[in-house]
Amino acid sequence: MAESMKGLHRTHRCTELSNSNVGEIVTVMGWVQKSRNKGGIIFVDLRDRSGLLQIIFEEGDIGTEMFEKASKLRSEFVVAVVGKVETRSGAVNENLLTGTIEVRATELRILSESETPPFPIEEGSKTKEELRLKYRYLDLRRPDLVRNLMLRSKVATLTRQFLSDEGFLEIETPMLTKSTPEGARDYLVPSRVHPGNFYALPQSPQIFKQLLMVSGYDRYFQIVKCFRDEDLRADRQPEFTQIDMELSFVDVDDVISVNERLLQKMFKESIGIDVSLPIQRMTWREAMDRYGSDKPDTRFGMELKNVSELVKDCGFAVFTGALENGGSVRGINANGQGEMPRKKIDALIEFAKGYGAKGLAYLSINEDGTYKSSFSKFMTEEELSALVAAMEAKPGDLLFFAADKDKVVFDVLGNLRLEIARNLELLDKNTYNFLWVTEFPLLEYSEEEGRYTAMHHPFTMPMDEDLPLLETDPGKVRAKAYDIVLNGTEVGGGSVRIFQNNVQEKMFEVLGFTKEEAYERFGFLLNAFKYGVPPHAGLAYGLDRLVMLMAKEDSIRDVIAFPKVKDASCLLTDAPNVVDDKQLEELSIALAKKATEE
């Protein structure tokens, strides 16, 4: 039967006690991690969010009745204990913060009993994720998840402190807003008051933070929930958290400067990592040419080399055919992997096919300087030697080549270098390599839609020198956009915004909107631009992704208290769920019956 904690007040969390507290009478409360009855003495590991503390119940100290109560303790019982802090009489536990002390109990209250949990509540549980998420309230008791959520809280606190000290105002923007279809799908919320009309949950506070700049709030931030109805993967959720900011009277360098100092403070004070400033910058073009990715992982080399010029006249039709069709031939050097078994090479070729490759050409350099290759019979010895030299290869190396349109080649080799690095365990989670990627293309052409779409969003300012190209060659326009990349993951991104109405209208025109359509969707922003707009720019971090990397986790689900799974459902609450007909009727909604196959 549960007891009351009336008259008791917790004096310390478990790991707040140390040798300096020896001799003190304390009251601690928490969950029983485990209990060991040694006959006449019971050892209990008590756990709270701070960690573990050993409690001793000795029959000679507390009497038979309380000792019998202590003998009934099981894992996950919630208890309150009053006792005296002592130096450990037995062996010191070097693995615990409290490993040199223990509390000798004088009073015990069982505040709540527990059924046997469906899985062990312990560090590094091997329990299947589905079961852990179904019982997330138990999973969240595990020390590794406690550490992750404490880290997340610390990062949010440091962010608020830093930005407040830098003159930013924390301002909330609406959760119920207007649907402006462009990019990912919106989550829609039906209006009861306006039948047949819908709100959208915001994919970002983009428009509202720009309106705040128009309103004169020249430095804004918030830590905010955003929503996107898109397919999930390890680093995506339907609802996610952004550290969002916007600044007036600034350009690219100003935004980067503030954020470099924020990252430096955040990493130093939360996980003890020094971030060297300034952070390296690289244009989008250079990132693609060197790494095949606009979010390159720079913890290792294996950079792409363009060998198109070298092979344009060779006898290998795969290479020459790609070049004749306007593509390129590029390669990577897997240093020291010349003895890779054919089975592993074949697995890498299959991997590359998953990114659009028709195949991969490969060449290994034997220790005696001879070559073993899938295409050597089509090239002369001189051509092969020139190719090896261009790839800066030496005996024992293995080269892979892709030949196709640039988009395919970059996608294939960019992902192949990561796969090889994973296989060779080159991705050190204790290394944090930041990189700014700048000067993205403003637009990309959608063959499916037959029009240009914004690579970031339609409010991004073109590079000043590229403005005339909006009229003549929109595909070549570069954006004043910047992403912050950490270990191959984009953790934040932003841009300088368009602040002249004529440029914004031109941007919408290039995107295929008529003036009427642009005003229908974004009229409130375009109208605001008629009343004096400061130059402004901003950036948003994905807090979930950032903390995931700081915590050295592989999925953002491990740094979110109550995450969704890949089909966007919640295993804990069974959301989404069917609602009553009455609720639908109040919202003037009727569900269409799906046709079923007979």
From Swiss-Prot:
* Endpoints of the signal sequence: none
Query: A Pfam family this protein belongs to?
Result: GAD
Enzyme class per UniProt: ligase
Gene Ontology terms: biological process: aspartyl-tRNA aminoacylation
Q: Cite the binding residues for ATP.
A: R228, D229, E230, Q237, E490, G542, L543, D544, R545
Q: What is its main location?
A: cytoplasm
SUPFAM superfamilies attached to this UniProt entry: Class II aaRS and biotin synthetases, GAD domain-like, Nucleic acid-binding proteins
Which HAMAP family does this entry report, sorted A to Z?
Asp_tRNA_synth_type1 (MF_00044)
Record protein name field: Aspartate--tRNA(Asp/Asn) ligase
Name the encoding gene, please. Answer: aspS
